[in-house]
């Protein structure tokens, strides 16, 4: 115990929630190295905080903060094990300090965050101490930190239930439009919170992903058509493609010629083809970009005007405001997304306890 101060023992106890004597022994074993002592207790199964940190954390909050000038914004997903803990004051303070640390040290990843200083110690130590105090595993799972040049606006939306957050960055040219772009970015963020687009644009998809999704989509439509046929309702068109990335110039030219050949066969005069073909092409593109309409932000129909896609809204605003608007970044966090929650089996639990 020589050279091991009471303050160091207390610090280790605060970080691990292990017993006082176990903390003393651990520090002696590793010659007073705090991090090695934490690892020692964890390996021995004596760190209660470490045990808590092994448990699945799928509740918590999504929180964001947008700068007053709308030139930067931060968003985090911080997980706890229960929604009850996510509502207590200690957890709320942790969320606040996390955002402050991200802003102060210009952090973009969870790895950077854990190493960053907070109150003269690494953030990771602070996090471990909060796990011990609060009594649940807490995990900073995702960080988004957007910064933009003067020609961009960044705005966001966090749902009141703190389970969904979105950040949107829009490029613009005309400074007088800045207030309108701020509002537009927030409205589009609200749309994305509700409609769950996976990516900004179809260019973010791989061709393999599109082909697999298209096969699933065709199977879904065929099944719907069976029911529609039974009920005497109109049938949906079966698409050949699923995304705009598949509609090359050659594909579109081939389809245009097919429509023209069809009109010729029907005996329609060539002088009226230009009035008919564009509408048919528009319908063809709509029928063959259903994956974009479901999964891309730009391809989805706007919740505030469901006759226009987000891309059309951006184009219309550009024209109306004499500007050239472009969505350059889109980030959406949904609490616990992708986390496999543990399913408790009460019967198995009782059986194990009886062995």
Swiss-Prot record:
The keyword Zinc does not apply. This is Elongation factor Ts. Residues 82-85 are annotated as: Involved in Mg(2+) ion dislocation from EF-Tu. Its main location: cytoplasm. It is found in: Cytoplasm. Belongs to the EF-Ts family. It comes from Helicobacter pylori (strain J99 / ATCC 700824). The keyword Transferase does not apply. Transmembrane segments: none annotated. Pfam families: EF_TS (PF00889). Associates with the EF-Tu.GDP complex and induces the exchange of GDP to GTP. It remains bound to the aminoacyl-tRNA.EF-Tu.GTP complex up to the GTP hydrolysis stage on the ribosome. GO terms for molecular function: translation elongation factor activity. Keywords: Cytoplasm, Elongation factor, Protein biosynthesis. GO terms for cellular component: cytoplasm. Gene3D superfamilies: 1.10.286.20, DNA helicase RuvA subunit, C-terminal domain, Elongation factor Ts, dimerisation domain. CDD domains: UBA_EF-Ts.
């Amino acid at each position: 115990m020589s050279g091991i101060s009471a303050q160091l023992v207390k610090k280790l106890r605060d970080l691990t929630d292990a017993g006082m004597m176990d903390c003393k022994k651990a520090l002696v074993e590793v010659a007073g190295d705090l991090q090695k002592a934490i690892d020692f207790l964890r390996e021995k199964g004596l760190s209660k905080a470490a045990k808590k940190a092994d448990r699945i954390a799928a509740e918590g909050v999504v929180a964001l903060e947008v700068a007053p000038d709308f030139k930067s914004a931060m968003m985090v997903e911080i997980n706890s094990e229960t929604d009850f803990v996510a509502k207590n004051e200690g957890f709320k303070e942790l969320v606040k300090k996390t955002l402050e640390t991200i802003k102060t040290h210009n952090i973009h990843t969870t790895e950077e965050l854990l190493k960053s200083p907070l109150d003269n110690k690494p953030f990771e130590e602070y996090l471990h101490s909060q796990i011990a105090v609060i009594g649940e595993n807490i995990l900073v799972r995702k960080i988004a930190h957007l910064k933009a040049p003067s020609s961009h606006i960044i705005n966001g939306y966090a749902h009141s239930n703190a389970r969904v957050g979105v950040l949107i960055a829009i490029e613009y040219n005309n400074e007088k439009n800045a207030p309108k772009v701020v509002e537009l970015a927030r409205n589009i963020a609200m749309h994305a919170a509700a409609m769950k687009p996976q990516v900004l644009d179809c260019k973010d998809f791989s061709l393999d992903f599109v082909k697999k999704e298209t096969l699933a989509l065709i199977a879904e439509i065929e099944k719907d058509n069976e029911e529609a046929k039974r009920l005497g309702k109109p049938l949906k068109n079966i698409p050949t493609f699923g995304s705009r990335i598949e509609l090359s110039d050659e594909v579109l030219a081939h389809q245009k010629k097919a429509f023209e050949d069809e009109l010729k066969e029907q005996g329609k005069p060539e002088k009226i083809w230009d009035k008919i073909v564009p509408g048919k092409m528009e319908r063809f593109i709509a029928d063959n970009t259903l994956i974009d309409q479901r999964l891309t932000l730009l391809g989805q129909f706007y919740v505030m005007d469901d006759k226009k896609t987000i891309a059309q809204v951006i184009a219309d605003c550009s024209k109306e405001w004499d500007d050239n608007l472009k969505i350059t970044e889109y980030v959406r966090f949904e609490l616990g997304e992708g986390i496999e929650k543990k399913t408790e089996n009460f019967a198995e639990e009782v059986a194990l306890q009886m062995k």
